[in-house]
Amino acid sequence: MADTHHAQGPGKSVLGIGQRIVSIMVEMVETRLRLAVVELEEEKANLFQLLLMLGLTMLFAAFGLMSLMVLIIWAVDPQYRLNAMIATTVVLLLLALIGGIWTLRKSRKSTLLRHTRHELANDRQLLEEESREQ
């Protein structure tokens, strides 16, 4: 008859608590990693679509602006064509500058891994509250 002894007493409860803490921490890390992977996949798909749409938009806008410039230059009297070319160039450069500044401001408001960072902040706050209570 095999006598199987299970640890009894305070040692068992300490080991059980330690195992539960480790398993909870592993589950938390696993959940956060899964969330980060899902968010990265979504951001990758969104970024690819955005770049494709941006490329097509820039291509069509360039052709449209070239056609518009040709029409404007043909519509103006020959003695004012140079002034018309200067004015259209200035307007286009100003629009490009405004668009560049707008793009930089928008890119600085990136939301990459926003939910993951939020969950990690919640975890940190809960751990800090638990450590203060003890």
Swiss-Prot record:
Look up the domain of life of the source: Bacteria
Query: Does the keyword section mention Membrane?
Result: yes
Cellular component GO terms, alphabetical: plasma membrane
Instruction: List where this protein forms a coiled coil.
Output: none
Q: Which Pfam families match?
A: Phage_holin_3_6 (PF07332)
Periplasmic side of the membrane: what ranges? 77-83
Membrane topology term? Multi-pass membrane protein
* Spans through the membrane: 56-76, 84-104
According to the UniProt topology, which residue ranges lie Cytoplasmic?
1-55, 105-134
Report the locations given in the UniProt record. Cell inner membrane
Listed A to Z, the keywords are:
Cell inner membrane, Cell membrane, Membrane, Transmembrane, Transmembrane helix
Q: What is this protein called?
A: Inner membrane protein YqjE
Q: Which organism is it from?
A: Escherichia coli (strain K12)
